[in-house]
From Swiss-Prot:
Heavily O-glycosylated at most but not all Ser and Thr residues. This is Submaxillary mucin. The mature protein contains tandemly repeated, identical sequences. Glycans are attached at residues 3, 7, 14-15, 23, 25, 27, 29, 34, 38, 42, 47, 49-50, 54, 59-60, 67-68, 73, 76, 78, 83. One of its GO terms (cellular component) is extracellular region. It comes from Canis lupus familiaris (Dog). The keyword Zinc-finger does not apply. Keywords: Glycoprotein, Secreted.
Amino acid sequence: AGSVGRTAGGPGFTSPGRVAGGTGSPTASARGGTPGGSEGFTAAPGSESTGGHSGAPGTTLAGRAGTTLGPRSEPSGTGVGGSPVATTL
Protein backbone atom coordinates (compact mmCIF):
# COMPACT_ATOMS: atom_id res chain seq x y z
CA ALA A 1 0.00 0.00 0.00
CA GLY A 2 3.00 2.27 0.37
CA SER A 3 4.96 3.85 -2.42
CA VAL A 4 8.16 2.14 -3.45
CA GLY A 5 11.33 4.17 -3.76
CA ARG A 6 14.73 3.53 -5.26
CA THR A 7 18.05 5.16 -4.65
CA ALA A 8 20.71 5.83 -7.25
CA GLY A 9 23.08 2.96 -6.61
CA GLY A 10 21.70 2.42 -3.12
CA PRO A 11 19.11 0.32 -1.31
CA GLY A 12 15.43 0.67 -2.04
CA PHE A 13 12.93 1.78 0.55
CA THR A 14 9.19 1.67 1.04
CA SER A 15 7.18 4.68 2.12
CA PRO A 16 4.42 3.81 4.62
CA GLY A 17 1.63 5.27 2.56
CA ARG A 18 0.33 7.94 0.19
CA VAL A 19 -0.96 11.44 0.57
CA ALA A 20 -4.73 11.80 0.80
CA GLY A 21 -6.33 13.14 -2.37
CA GLY A 22 -3.84 11.53 -4.71
CA THR A 23 -4.68 9.12 -7.50
CA GLY A 24 -3.68 6.12 -5.43
CA SER A 25 -0.98 5.23 -7.94
CA PRO A 26 2.41 4.17 -6.61
CA THR A 27 5.07 6.86 -6.72
CA ALA A 28 8.62 6.09 -7.76
CA SER A 29 11.27 7.92 -5.77
CA ALA A 30 14.97 8.49 -6.30
CA ARG A 31 17.18 9.98 -3.63
CA GLY A 32 20.77 10.66 -2.78
CA GLY A 33 21.74 10.42 0.84
CA THR A 34 24.23 10.27 3.65
CA PRO A 35 23.86 8.39 6.93
CA GLY A 36 21.04 9.96 8.91
CA GLY A 37 17.45 9.51 9.87
CA SER A 38 15.27 11.22 7.29
CA GLU A 39 14.73 11.67 3.58
CA GLY A 40 13.68 14.94 2.02
CA PHE A 41 10.93 14.92 -0.57
CA THR A 42 10.10 17.66 -3.05
CA ALA A 43 7.68 17.85 -5.93
CA ALA A 44 8.93 17.62 -9.50
CA PRO A 45 7.31 18.02 -12.93
CA GLY A 46 4.72 15.30 -13.33
CA SER A 47 4.45 14.70 -9.61
CA GLU A 48 1.23 13.80 -7.87
CA SER A 49 2.06 13.92 -4.18
CA THR A 50 4.71 13.54 -1.52
CA GLY A 51 4.99 10.49 0.70
CA GLY A 52 2.18 9.60 3.05
CA HIS A 53 4.29 10.31 6.12
CA SER A 54 5.73 13.58 4.85
CA GLY A 55 6.08 16.67 6.99
CA ALA A 56 2.63 17.80 5.90
CA PRO A 57 0.38 14.72 5.62
CA GLY A 58 -2.62 15.24 3.40
CA THR A 59 -0.90 17.68 1.07
CA THR A 60 -1.53 16.83 -2.55
CA LEU A 61 -0.11 18.12 -5.80
CA ALA A 62 -3.04 16.93 -7.88
CA GLY A 63 -3.62 19.48 -10.63
CA ARG A 64 -0.40 21.28 -9.76
CA ALA A 65 2.26 19.19 -11.49
CA GLY A 66 5.66 20.78 -11.29
CA THR A 67 4.86 22.80 -8.18
CA THR A 68 7.57 22.64 -5.56
CA LEU A 69 6.15 22.56 -2.05
CA GLY A 70 9.55 22.43 -0.37
CA PRO A 71 11.35 19.72 1.55
CA ARG A 72 9.39 17.06 3.34
CA SER A 73 10.87 14.90 6.06
CA GLU A 74 10.18 11.20 5.80
CA PRO A 75 11.41 8.58 8.28
CA SER A 76 14.06 6.39 6.73
CA GLY A 77 13.66 2.66 7.05
CA THR A 78 17.18 2.19 5.71
CA GLY A 79 18.97 4.56 8.07
CA VAL A 80 19.84 6.78 5.14
CA GLY A 81 18.98 10.45 5.15
CA GLY A 82 19.58 12.65 2.17
CA SER A 83 18.92 15.50 -0.15
CA PRO A 84 15.45 16.26 -1.52
CA VAL A 85 14.15 13.75 -4.03
CA ALA A 86 11.48 13.77 -6.70
CA THR A 87 8.32 11.73 -6.30
CA THR A 88 6.72 11.09 -9.68
CA LEU A 89 3.84 8.96 -10.89
